[in-house]
């Protein structure tokens, strides 16, 4: 448990705060990029990770009878909602189960089920999530995924925010919302820096915490760290370099991410000691230390555009302005001190 102990965070004075019994909407985003999972298959497989996520979902639903969940999968081909299913699918399946149970006449024994003792809501979520996720994986062009090596993480965040906006803010339901992103870490995720940051700003405005659980040995994702920091979420890197093993994913999920946002001021949570706040270049999509900023739209560039136009607002820069940017800073000559 020392791996998730946030000793750097001090407990806040919350004596005047009162807890309420408000239900919570949890939107879980699952990375379904198969080539990335193949790189860490010796540590954990995608089926094992999904099993841990389902245990976490059931624990969330068990905390409050009005809690709800939304599951989204994404890969290089795009993002799609896995749960809840399309309208009518879940209700039809529930009716079929009820009809089968009611069709048993008096004096007859009902047919035994493999998971008869399982809570119906847990069973429904487990079946739908697994079925929809495997359908998504089976209909994915893996040849194209190998070539692209990127993901639709911004599209998945947009789906999650849209679902939350519809079921929490538009319907005016008395419910809190948060997002949990399970990612393996892709080499070219910085390509989606701009649309992802737009989603982060939207979540920050709506006061929706974004939690990130990163698996694998890859480097930390800069914009995901920024997302957790700006939305008061939790960022946890589960990899061997941090003395953590993905084999214990269910333990990390239940220990670090199960707490409701209303309870987080009262407990010690995993913290980020070093957050990289550098931005990404709008041209090369790479993180930069020093760059140029457009005076019109604040676009960040690591190099001067060859066509002398801003890649975002299409503003044309004058040659005089660009010539001044290419010059090295002038050094003041030191005056010689003449000794008397």
Curated annotation (Swiss-Prot):
Gene3D superfamilies: von Willebrand factor, type A domain (3.40.50.410). The keyword Transmembrane does not apply. Residues 92-103 have a biased composition (Basic and acidic residues). One of its GO terms (cellular component) is nucleotide-excision repair factor 3 complex. Keywords: DNA damage, DNA repair, Metal-binding, Nucleus, Transcription, Transcription regulation, Zinc, Zinc-finger. One of its GO terms (biological process) is nucleotide-excision repair. It comes from the Eukaryota. A zinc finger (C4-type) spans 294-313. Residues 85-117 are annotated as: Disordered. It is found in: Nucleus. Disulfide bonds: none annotated. Component of the 7-subunit TFIIH core complex composed of XPB/SSL2, XPD/RAD3, SSL1, TFB1, TFB2, TFB4 and TFB5, which is active in NER. The core complex associates with the 3-subunit CTD-kinase module TFIIK composed of CCL1, KIN28 and TFB3 to form the 10-subunit holoenzyme (holo-TFIIH) active in transcription. This is General transcription and DNA repair factor IIH subunit TFB4. The gene is TFB4.
């Amino acid at each position: 448990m020392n791996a998730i102990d946030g000793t750097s965070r001090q407990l806040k004075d919350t004596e005047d705060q009162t807890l309420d019994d408000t239900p919570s909407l949890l939107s879980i985003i699952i990375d379904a990029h198969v080539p990335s999972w193949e790189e860490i298959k010796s540590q954990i497989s995608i089926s094992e990770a999904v099993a841990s996520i389902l245990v976490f979902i059931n624990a969330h639903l068990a905390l409050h009878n009005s809690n709800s969940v939304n599951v989204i999968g994404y890969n290089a081909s795009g993002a799609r909602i896995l749960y809840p299913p399309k309208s009518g699918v879940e209700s039809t399946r529930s009716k079929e189960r009820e009809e089968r149970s009611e069709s048993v006449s008096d004096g007859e024994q009902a047919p035994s089920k493999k998971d008869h003792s399982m809570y119906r809501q847990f069973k429904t979520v487990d079946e739908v999530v697994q079925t929809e996720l495997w359908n998504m994986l089976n209909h994915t062009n893996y040849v194209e995924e190998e070539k692209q090596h990127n993901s639709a993480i911004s599209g998945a965040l947009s789906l999650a925010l849209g679902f939350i906006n519809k079921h929490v803010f538009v319907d005016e339901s008395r419910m809190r919302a948060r997002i949990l992103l399970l990612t393996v870490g892709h080499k070219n995720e910085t390509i989606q820096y701009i649309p992802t940051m737009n989603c982060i700003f939207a979540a920050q405005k709506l006061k929706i915490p974004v939690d990130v659980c990163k698996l694998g040995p890859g480097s930390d994702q800069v914009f995901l760290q920024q997302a957790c920091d700006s939305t008061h979420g939790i960022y946890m890197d589960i990899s061997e370099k941090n003395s953590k093993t993905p084999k214990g994913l269910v333990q990390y999920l239940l220990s670090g991410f199960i707490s409701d946002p209303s309870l987080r001021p009262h407990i010690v949570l995993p913290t980020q000691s070093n957050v990289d706040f550098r931005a990404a270049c709008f041209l090369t999509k790479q993180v930069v230390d020093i760059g140029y900023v457009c005076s019109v739209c604040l676009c960040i560039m690591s190099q001067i555009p060859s066509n002398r136009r801003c890649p975002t607002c299409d503003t044309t820069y004058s040659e005089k302005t660009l010539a001044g940017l290419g010059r090295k800073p002038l050094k003041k000559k030191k005056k010689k001190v003449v000794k008397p």
